[in-house]
């Protein structure tokens, strides 16, 4: 056994340099030291002599050699591959640099250095890719979100969800101060301003404030139209603004000056009628009546209330001296009243010469003629309507129950001495028409009826009635109030309004 131990040591030292034959292993493993090589050479002779000493030495040799080969041979190859991976990044990026997804190509090309993306059609800058895609649908016409009930299509899902509420009738946003309910949050926000005293929207032309932005925009359109009027100079506009600030009645002044420029009014700006009261004038209204500037100021809250207060305050005695001045134009007071309160025109019917026919049924004509009243206002007698005869039959039935008897001159104007001071001006139009026309709904209730005496059209809605009356001209009922087109009769006027050919005739 003593001889076997050196043999085992010799064989183990001989087997160690075997893996060094591989060139890869030379790079990773160091060579044996010089003194170890000398020891091996000195022991080769006794080892060769004792090769046949025993089989145990061969078993030990095979066991150690197999284990060393399994450990040392795979490791240099694996280490060589793994050592090359950290230095192959440039090659990997060069391979992936040419690969781009199709959906990201427009994203990369349209994204500028500032962080926003530009539309390749119109150049609009968008803050995100989703906003850009929604914007591009306006160019392509794509509407992917469609309503399954009516077929309406939308570019965004939020618009579709808002549209669906129209079918369901859902109104989730409710006012905590009243019974108002709406489908959109911004509509509720605008409604809440009506309950507050704050008026955040102010006009830079005249200084008037409004609660709603839409009211301010409508007012600014009227102010711009007045400032751009070529008939008035800059000095007149500045003076008008000073008067406006001093008297606090810019609304009446703007309407007064707009009346002289009716033909230049835009078709997209219908007249706005203020007030909830429904009045009808039983007495004739003569457009020749003129008011002085001191008596012309009205309250800014309710225009209809201001008109009633002015007439009741002045009375017939104050109006008499003004009747004897027919040459004065009617561009000041009459258009203001007719533009804000059109029912006065419908009940009086002064432009088409109908007051003479109407008053014959309820006023006895005297034999004597006053010389001072021979002159008639040109606006009251010069323009005759083509359907005056038809109005005669209708009004005979409407006013045959009236028993008021007043003396009247030949020109159709009643004598102001006989006119009572308290005018009966507060009769609503439905009461005036119920004696002749009755409209009954399905519940059997009598509905309110509003009649246009110029067109012979009945309206069940007061708002539609006021809009229709705003289409009639101030001086001539068959003159379009939006473009100035003059019709020969009510049929041509109705056709003109139905076609809506106003923009081509604007000056």
From Swiss-Prot:
InterPro entries: Ikaros_C2H2-ZF (IPR050589), Znf_C2H2_sf (IPR036236), Znf_C2H2_type (IPR013087)
Tissue occurrence: Expression is restricted to lymphoid tissues. Expressed at highest levels in spleen and at lower levels in the thymus and bone marrow. First detected in more committed lymphoid progenitors and strongly up-regulated as these differentiate into pre-T and pre-B cell precursors.
Sequence segments annotated as region (Mediates homodimerization and heterodimerization): 450-502
Basic and acidic residues bias (residue ranges): 33-46, 56-72
C2H2-type ZnF: 117-139, 145-167, 173-195, 201-223, 450-472, 478-502
Similarity comment: family membership: Belongs to the Ikaros C2H2-type zinc-finger protein family.
Subunit and interaction comment: Homodimer. Heterodimer with other IKAROS family members. Interacts with IKZF4 and IKZF5. Interacts with HRAS. Interacts with FOXP3; this interaction may be required for silencing target genes and regulating the suppressive activity of FOXP3-positive regulatory T-cells (Treg). Interacts with BCL21L isoform Bcl-X(L); this interaction blocks the anti-apoptotic role of BCL21L. Associates with histone deacetylase complexes containing HDAC1, MTA2 and SIN3A. Interacts with IKZF1.
UniProt cross-link Glycyl lysine isopeptide (Lys-Gly) (interchain with G-Cter in SUMO2), position: 61, 73, 100, 244
Domain of life: Eukaryota
The protein's name: Zinc finger protein Aiolos
Main location: nucleus
Biological process terms in GO annotation: B cell differentiation; positive regulation of transcription by RNA polymerase II; regulation of apoptotic process; regulation of B cell differentiation; regulation of B cell proliferation; regulation of lymphocyte differentiation; response to bacterium; T cell differentiation
Taxonomic lineage: Eukaryota, Metazoa, Chordata, Craniata, Vertebrata
Keywords: B-cell activation, Cytoplasm, DNA-binding, Isopeptide bond, Metal-binding, Nucleus, Phosphoprotein, Repeat, Transcription, Transcription regulation, Ubl conjugation, Zinc, Zinc-finger
